[in-house]
């Protein structure tokens, strides 16, 4: 009998959210899934179920779109393991752009500037005022966080640093011990993890687009090295960047 030791990391960006549909900068604001987003989450659960592997640990961000995506997946898998919620896996904080329409801001600031805000490595938008109701300091779920942990704005680099720190401290060792992990997170937190795992440079990361609701499965060999990576929903994976 040959026993193959392998672990799997499944990364999924939450299903389509209400503000994805409205083309708004969402960041740390809590908006739920659209009906389409719920369908994406259920479909994700189905394609993960077809793998026939046991998921040992589940993680989500503090945000309802990530939490509910994971709930739909776990319900489909009939897996009742208590998920870990980590604010460090939250979406990038978009500062003063939060709640604004992307198309309107392109007209106001120019397409180039908005592209820089969205895709550059270390550019931060102006900070969000603490008086703004969308500021995390005014949202109940973040009351447990220290004030030094709550950002007013973030670059992708800032997001990368908190996401990767959390991954190294809480998830990396579990992968090395042949655990299967599923993380339900966000476009920029998953881009950050991909930069770290696949050793992407700053130019490559700007081109990486993460689709909603399509699980990316990364396989690790017995030495903890990546041996394979693919999107599980084949119908939607044709034009996606896969390493």
Predicted regions: what they are:
Residues 16-74, 147-165, 207:
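Loop-to-helix element that buttresses phosphate recognition and phosphoryl-transfer chemistry
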Residues 1-5:
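Short, Lys/Arg-enriched N-terminal segments with co-localized hydrophobic residues
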Residues 42-136, 142-144, 195-219, 242-243:
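Phosphate-coordination/substrate-recognition cap region in phosphate-metabolizing enzymes
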Residues 235-243:
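Short, cationic low-complexity segments
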Residues 9, 67, 75-77, 150, ...:
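Active-site-adjacent alpha-helix immediately C-terminal to a catalytic or transition-state-stabilizing loop
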Residues 7-16:
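Short coil-to-beta-strand
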Residues 223-236:
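Short, well-ordered strand-loop elements centered on a beta-strand within folded domains, enriched
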Residues 14, 88, 186:
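Active-site glycine-centered loops adjacent to acidic/histidine catalytic or metal-binding residues
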């Amino acid at each position: 009998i040959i026993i193959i030791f392998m672990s799997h990391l499944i990364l999924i960006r939450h299903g389509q959210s209400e503000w994805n549909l409205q083309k708004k900068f969402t960041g740390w604001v809590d908006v739920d899934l659209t009906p389409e987003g719920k369908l994406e989450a259920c479909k994700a659960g189905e394609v993960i179920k077809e793998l026939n592997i046991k998921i040992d640990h589940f993680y989500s961000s503090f945000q309802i779109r990530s939490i509910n995506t994971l709930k739909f997946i776990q319900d489909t898998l009939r897996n009742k393991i208590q998920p870990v919620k980590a604010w460090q896996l939250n979406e990038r904080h978009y500062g003063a752009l939060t709640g604004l329409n992307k198309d309107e801001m392109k007209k106001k600031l120019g397409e180039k500037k908005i592209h820089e805000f969205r895709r550059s490595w270390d550019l931060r938008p102006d900070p969000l005022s603490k008086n703004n109701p969308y500021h995390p300091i005014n949202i109940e779920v973040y009351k447990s966080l220290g004030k030094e942990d709550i950002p007013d704005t973030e670059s992708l680099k800032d997001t990368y640093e908190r996401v990767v720190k959390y991954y190294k401290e809480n998830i990396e060792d579990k992968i090395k011990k042949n655990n299967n992990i599923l993380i339900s997170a966000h476009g920029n937190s998953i881009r950050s993890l991909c930069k770290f795992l696949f050793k992407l440079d700053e130019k490559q990361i700007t081109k990486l687009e993460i689709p909603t609701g399509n699980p990316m499965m990364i396989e690790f060999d017995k030495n903890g090295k990546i041996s394979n990576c693919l999107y599980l929903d084949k119908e939607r994976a044709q034009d996606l960047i896969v390493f």
